[in-house]
Amino acid sequence: MQAERGARGGRGRRGGRERPGGDREPVGAATALARGGCGDGGGRRGRGRGFRRGRGGGGLRGGRWEPGGRGGGASTRVEEDSDSETYGEENDEQGNFSRRKIVSNWDRYQDTEKEVNGESGESQRGTDFSVLLSSAGDSFSQFRFAEEKEWDGETSCPKQNSALYVDSESLVRALEQLPLAVRLNVASELIQTTIPLELPQVKPRRNDDGKELGMHLRGPISELRSAAGACPRSLGRGSLRQSPLEGLQKAPTPTQSVADHLEEELDMLLHLDAPVQEEGNISPDQTSRDQEPEKDGQVAQEETGPEKPSVTREKNVEPEQPSTSKNVTEEELEDWLDSMIS
């Protein structure tokens, strides 16, 4: 009875109590530990060693208190099993993920190449696009509806659709047989069928006026200079402003008069410096002042007629012009030229 009580965790006498100072180990200690209890095998008073937490007191497992007793051991064991399984799964997953590698499947293609080489003796990893298209088949090999098959079955005959059928080759041959005038839709007279043996001669138009001018200018220089010496050197402002073209336009129709006028223009161009120097020395203010007394003298002559003072006055004005023209500086001459140009 006592042995049974000890196995059950009762009050029975324990075998180690008779030894003084010895460790008392209950008979049912192994059974109590197997059940998850601690102390004295899960006794009522909790006399076992360790932490006394009543009947079947729990113990410290993994840094936390686990429930003891009859039902505590089984639940703890299930939790430990589940924790170990999850921890193992995590370790397995981490290990598999870290060790994962890309597996090449090129061996399959190499096997197929070996077979092809054994059959034909040629190694070809890729084929041409045309070969792929030919192997794919045409549109008739694909899926088609029943209506499409019916359309293909109905072969169109040119005799049935004569209104819509046109033979292009025969049309081209018929058009080539037509004459060129009909094809171009122009008059037949405009088209020259034969090639001419001689081309028509085109006579260029000559400028007679330019020829005459060139012949006059080609004359000897001595004659031009002699003719130029005959013309007066004192030219007015109007003659300076006239261009050679204006002089030619105003020239008379006879050739002699044209030649004389050309000589005059040439002499004018050769002696441009002399009249410019003579007239350039006269400022516009002085010319206006000189013109005023001339006008006054003319008016006085018309009014008084035989009065001598007006005549003497005109004579005195004329010699004054060259004396005053010499005193004009170059700056005044440039100013006058600028005023004339503007």
Swiss-Prot record:
GO biological process: apoptotic process; negative regulation of apoptotic process
Basic residues composition bias: residue spans: 44-55
Membrane topology of the entry: Peripheral membrane protein
Biased composition annotated in UniProt, kind: Gly residues: 56-74
InterPro entries from the UniProt entry: Aven
Residue ranges, compositional bias (Polar residues): 120-130
Compositionally biased region (Acidic residues): 80-93, 330-342
Compositional bias annotation for Basic and acidic residues: 15-26, 108-117, 287-297
Positions carrying Phosphoserine: S82, S84
Keyword Membrane belongs to the record: yes
Taxonomy, superkingdom: Eukaryota
GO CC terms in record: endomembrane system; membrane
General function of this protein: Protects against apoptosis mediated by Apaf-1.
Assembly mode: Binds Apaf-1, BCL-2 and BAD (Bcl-xl).
Listed PANTHER family: CELL DEATH REGULATOR AVEN
Protein name per UniProt: Cell death regulator Aven
Organism: Mus musculus (Mouse)
Lineage: Eukaryota, Metazoa, Chordata, Craniata, Vertebrata
